[in-house]
């Protein structure tokens, strides 16, 4: 292999690595100790609270765990609860807009950029489909996610401002 071929191969490899990091972000999740502790306690506790300072990874920590449960793809270090079958899950925020801008973005990718679909915690190749939320630009009401069991998990995006009747 000559120098040019080696360089072309190195460039192709770098592009593939970048693509995998972009569209399989969860594969590169390396939690901080407080995040790992949060995940681990899920084995014994149905309800947990992750209360920390701003901008240190709470949202992505929750999105990473939700992505693992929706897909059934767990890393080797995982000690928390595991779902071997597809699940139905609810993800909620204060408003439709905050649910879209935080929860949906962390799970699926930035809502305003169609090219970024699949750059969130859920790998692009696991996103089967989604349904648009009426009246909220770029927001989804649900996502269908491929689970390793062969079935599809469903994630519903909800907001607290919609009232309790929307949660029942």
Feature-to-residue mapping (PLM):
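Phosphate/NTP-binding elements of NTP-utilizing enzymes
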Residues: 1-168
């Amino acid at each position: 292999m000559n120098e040019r071929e080696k360089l072309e191969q190195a460039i192709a490899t770098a592009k593939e690595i970048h693509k995998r990091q972009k569209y399989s972000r969860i594969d590169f999740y390396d939690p901080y100790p407080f995040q790992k502790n949060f995940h681990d306690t899920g084995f014994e506790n149905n309800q947990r609270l992750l209360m920390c300072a701003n901008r240190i990874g709470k949202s992505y920590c929750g999105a990473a765990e939700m992505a693992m449960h929706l897909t059934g793809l767990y890393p080797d270090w995982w000690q928390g609860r595991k779902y071997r079958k597809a699940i139905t899950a609810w993800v909620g925020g204060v408003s439709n807009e905050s649910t879209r801008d935080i929860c949906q973005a962390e799970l699926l990718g930035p809502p305003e950029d169609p090219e970024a679909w699949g750059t969130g915690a859920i790998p692009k190749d696991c996103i089967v489909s989604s349904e648009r939320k009426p009246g909220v630009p770029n927001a989804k009401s649900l996502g269908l996610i491929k689970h390793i069991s062969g079935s599809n998990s469903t994630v519903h995006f909800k907001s607290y401002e919609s009232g309790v009747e929307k949660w029942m």
